[in-house]
Amino acid sequence: MSIIFKPLEQKELPEFRADVKRIFSIAVIATFGEPENEDDIISDDIVNESLQNPLCESFSIYEGREKVGGVVLKIDRDTWHNEAEILYIYPEKHGSGLGQRVWRAIEQKYPQTKVWRLITPYFEKRNIHFYVNKCGFRIVEFFNKAHRHPEWSPSALDFHDEFFVFEKVM
């Protein structure tokens, strides 16, 4: 079946934010236990920042007629150094090869891309395996307490403020 990217409509944004929180919480809860506040996983502000960024394109992902996930991509049409800001596949679809098909479809949708970039938490072993071993990314940087992301406020991060930066040169 083909992968289809359907642009998000305003009325779909609450469901998109809820999906992101629910799916991103799986590894957080497995690693650290239940958080005191759901914003400890990913805040609405962070999701909204991506959704409202004029460089970002936001989609629901379908395989045929079935919704299987969502994505927010930051597309820089000047440099073609693009970023996957948010990408999720529904957990019941994990392990089926769908993620690889989705990533290939993203690459095909933006063939001018020179470099793809994304950031994922250090404890997300499933993501690390997927991006490195299945999609051909490499880890190029590690943000942590001693090496902070230049755009992130130290007060905005908490105990799990360690992230890998991945890149894939096309």
Descriptions of predicted regions:
Residues 25-47:
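Conserved GNAT-fold acetyl-CoA-binding loop/helix
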Residues 58-60, 66-75, 83, 88:
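Conserved beta-strand in the GNAT
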Residues 42-60, 69, 159:
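A short helix-loop-beta-strand connector motif used in the catalytic cores of GNAT acetyltransferases and
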Residues 109-122:
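Conserved GNAT acetyl-CoA-binding A-motif
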Residues 4-18:
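A short beta-loop-alpha structural element at the N-terminal edge
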Residues 89, 95-108, 133:
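Conserved acetyl-CoA-binding loop-helix of GNAT-fold acetyltransferases
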Residues 80-91, 119-120:
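Conserved acetyl-CoA binding element of GNAT-fold acetyltransferases
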Residues 119-120, 128, 133-156:
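Conserved catalytic-core motifs of GNAT/GCN5-like acyltransferases
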